Amino acid sequence: MNEEFMKERPVLPLLLSMALPMILSMLVNSLYNIVDSFFVAKISEDAMTALSLVFPIQNFVNAVAIGFGVGINAVIAFYLGAKEPDKANAAASKGTLLSVVHGVIMTVVCILIMPGFLRMFTSNETVVQMGIQYSMIVFAFSVIISIDLSFEKIYQAVGRMVVTMVGLGGGCLMNIVLDPLLIFGIGPFPKMGIRGAALATGLGQVFTLLIYLFVYVFRPISVKIGRRYLHTEDYLTGKLYAIGIPAILNMALPSLLTTALNAILSTYSQIYVVILGIYYKLQTFLYLPANGMIQGMRPVISYNYGAGEHKRVRSIYNITLTIIGMIMVFGTVICLIFPDKLIGMFSDNQATITEGATALRIICAGFIGSSVSVTSSGALEGLGKGTPSLMISLLRYVVVIIPVAFVLSRIFGVVGVWNAFWVAELITAVAALFIYRQAVKRKS
């Protein structure tokens, strides 16, 4: 099998070779929402608010697709490391079919709930209607997103990171080109407003899938997808969900957090809801490189775990933690030096820029601490330990930050919400280190 390099190459060069294509592709992919926000902000402040309110549900759809993809990735890489290719093929085939099912369900559910969901956070009917227009189109592509992520994780499991980089990059470039054309009606294209932003995003995702399918057909990989594998290794469905469900919850929890914080912030002013939406778009530039490292690390740590290379597993964890810590230091410095310029990328409103700069300076105090929880949670997913990974994410996104944000907002006002971020990150970092060590010790 040509995946042997994952246990033979030195750890640092191996991690970088696996992670750098993912970091580049995820940085480019982060432009999906960034580009939408940039052009939508040119429409109106109401349009930007609508996009911010839809974001948690949009993020949930991605969470389901990515989270289940993590299960596909971990199971395939484990069986490749254990030299059981038939089981790897079955995992890929079953995982792809289940991803299609998930996409259909999410399309129906998300479109149905959006009107009521939007009215929970705003009484501005213009914002509600813009949110519905955007949602009806963007969620119609949920099946495409699910299949995209299934193929992405399969390619990652066999070490073909460049394929995912090209696929994600191609889709993003398509989105960047189509956004202004469809939003503002340039040339022969219709002027669709916020609906154009949604359609551009969906067509970009379709283009990504076409790239993946082209490579699968003309540049075959060691893992095969086929109907004949669907009726074998029935227990693998349970194994996929055993890792995938905690990973889905891990990915979905930020949406729950955003919804809860929007509810708190909306009691003060719509400006703060916009600021939170802008922050989450900005932080993608920081956390997506970190997540790119995790995506590069995950198949490597899973493969070596399946091959019984436990000392190498420890080395992979430690090196990944160090690199992610360096990324977070860089992000903290940038946010402290240029907060107003960063917020100003997405708003011309001086009040939003001023308040947003204050928020960014406070929130970034927790970036460095988050490197421990991000690395520990990702490593546990790669090792097939979904429950401990979920425990870390629950602490980070629900158990600590939401109560702290609520209490501090009652004492210090809106500034208390921003301070809740770094308080939660520091508490979670200590807990994550303990949970990771206990989970690894218990199994080894």
What annotation goes with each model-predicted range?
Residues 1-19, 76-143, 189-245, 301-366, ...:
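Short alpha-helical transmembrane segments in multi-pass integral membrane proteins
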Residues 8, 12-31, 35, 57-64, ...:
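Residue-level signal for short hydrophobic patches within transmembrane helices
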Residues 69, 73, 138-156, 164-172, ...:
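Short runs within selected transmembrane alpha-helices of multi-pass transporters and secretion channels
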